Design a protein with these regions (language model features):
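Long, leucine- and charge-enriched amphipathic alpha-helices
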Residues: 82-86
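Structural signal for interior beta-strand "rungs" in well-ordered beta-sheet cores
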Residues: 1-77
Length: 86
């Protein structure tokens, strides 16, 4: 059985997808249409905007604006991640 952990006071928007082994710390706000890849973690008191994609295994430690794709640890914009991790 695959589990996810959603802590206290977390708000999750409509049509969001959360894969297995994800942890979301307390009082975070997840927008609408968000996709969170497996084995990712989101620190507490963060705002994840609408239409955000978080790649698997990512560690989110700061707010993510709307319409952004991030990955890595710490999570950063996918273009920056791909440029620095060739």
């Amino acid at each position: 059985m695959v589990k996810i952990h959603i802590a206290h006071n977390v708000k999750i928007g409509k049509n969001s997808i959360i894969a297995g082994q994800v942890g979301i710390a307390g009082s975070s706000v997840i927008g609408n249409n968000v996709k969170i890849g497996g084995q990712s973690g989101i620190s507490g008191h963060l705002k994840i905007g609408n239409n955000v994609e978080i790649g698997g295994g990512s560690g989110v430690i700061k707010d993510i604006p709307d319409d952004t794709k991030v990955m890595g640890y710490p999570a950063k914009n996918i273009r920056e991640f791909l440029r620095t991790n060739k």
